[in-house]
């Protein structure tokens, strides 16, 4: 699984019935810009099951933090919402995304719209 780095879950917080967040260890070599997302996932039947998640923690933090909605029948989220401290999680080695300040054109107003967790990318 060279595409992924195995990290360890450090904390899990269930905010309410539909939202949760978790932090993981972070490979020292992982570099990303604020606004990037990473593929994260779990190994299921010997294969990675992964989806794109915005990184909530700033790029200078020692750990990674992610925020998610709970999807009862979601292929990954239904499993991810049940992780515990100490569990292993797969984190992609290649950050990507275009929600970067440097990509925005100067303007008087900035409107940020999103779906799902809403505030996670901001």
Annotate each PLM feature.
Residues 2-85:
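Ferredoxin-reductase
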Residues 75-122:
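FNR/FR-type flavoprotein reductase catalytic core
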